[in-house]
Amino acid sequence: MRKLDEQREVLYVIRTLDVLMSSGVGLEAAIHTIGSGGYGIISEDFSSMMKRLRKGNSRGLGPELKGLMSKADSEGYRRLLNTMYTNVTQNTDIIETIRKQGTR
């Protein structure tokens, strides 16, 4: 069930991230927006991650994304999380990478 929900929603999440971040919204704000709802299990994952970050019950965004990668069941969602993690740890061009993922 989780895998099916991830597969169904990941393309919409990718497109939303593309639009938000191309408009100048930062990664954390984009994650917060997606966590607000409308994207199934991915919204739940992002919402709980942001709650832990806000409460200080986390070691940071990078480790949180790494944890979600091990929890992800679908390849597309895992790839998106890996892209986000790489951007946080190595400061890569996330917008271009997300656009490429959205066209696959």
Task: Please place each PLM-identified region on the residue numbering.
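Hydrophobic alpha-helical transmembrane segments
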Residues: 62-88, 93, 98
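Juxtamembrane/interface alpha-helical elements of multi-pass membrane proteins
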Residues: 1-66, 79
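Hydrophobic alpha-helical signal-anchor/transmembrane segments
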Residues: 1-12, 73, 89, 93-96, ...
